[in-house]
């Protein structure tokens, strides 16, 4: 079970005094909570407890909605995978190949790494040289936007990271 610590805002703050940081990041020192609330309301912002300490909490005057939005955005970015994988067969058509290369260009421009893997099954193993040439072609096609992080011709995998 994950315990989410809820931030206290405005009238939820029960402490008689807070250590205040105003909306311009100036340290205001120890101030009564009521007075800090009045300051926050005068600039049409919220009083948010940033750090709950034993003696007096540290409160900051800011836009609480904007703070929540930025926190949610940071969580989304940290959860996003950074390695995208594209799988090929040795006899892929030109249109499919170009489509995958375009996708890889978009991912590399966003900052994600791209891993290309060529899968050989059964009788396709006789096309191993052709698959190796395809890996080289992928590297040359993406050389403008990315650089090779690892190239393994034995297992037919190449990983390209943004340049």
Curated annotation (Swiss-Prot):
SUPFAM superfamilies: Translation initiation factor IF3, C-terminal domain, Translation initiation factor IF3, N-terminal domain. PROSITE patterns: IF3 (PS00938). It comes from Nostoc sp. (strain PCC 7120 / SAG 25.82 / UTEX 2576). One of its GO terms (cellular component) is cytoplasm. PANTHER family: TRANSLATION INITIATION FACTOR IF-3, TRANSLATION INITIATION FACTOR IF-3, MITOCHONDRIAL. This is Translation initiation factor IF-3-like. GO terms for molecular function: ribosome binding; translation initiation factor activity. Gene3D superfamilies: Translation initiation factor 3 (IF-3), C-terminal domain (3.30.110.10), Translation initiation factor 3 (IF-3), N-terminal domain (3.10.20.80). Pfam families: IF3_C, IF3_N. Keywords: Initiation factor, Protein biosynthesis. Transmembrane segments: none annotated. One of its GO terms (biological process) is ribosome disassembly. InterPro entries: T_IF-3_C_sf, T_IF-3_N_sf, Translation_initiation_fac3_CS, Translation_initiation_fac_3, Translation_initiation_fac_3_C, Translation_initiation_fac_3_N. Belongs to the IF-3 family.
């Amino acid at each position: 079970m994950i315990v989410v610590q809820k931030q206290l805002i405005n009238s939820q703050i029960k402490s008689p005094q807070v250590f205040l940081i105003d909306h311009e990041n100036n340290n205001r020192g120890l101030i009564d909570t009521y007075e800090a609330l009045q300051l926050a309301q005068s600039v049409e912002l919220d009083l948010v407890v940033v750090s709950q300490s034993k003696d007096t909490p540290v409160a900051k005057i800011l836009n609480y909605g904007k703070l929540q939005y930025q926190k949610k955005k940071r969580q989304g970015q940290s959860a996003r995978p950074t390695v995208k994988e594209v799988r090929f067969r040795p006899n892929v058509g030109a249109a499919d190949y170009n489509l995958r290369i375009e996708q890889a260009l978009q991912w590399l421009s966003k900052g994600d790494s791209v891993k290309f893997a060529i899968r050989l099954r059964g009788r396709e193993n006789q096309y191993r040289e052709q698959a190796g040439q395809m890996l080289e072609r992928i590297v040359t096609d993406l050389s403008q936007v990315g650089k090779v992080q690892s190239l393994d011709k034995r297992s037919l995998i190449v990983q390209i990271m943004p340049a």
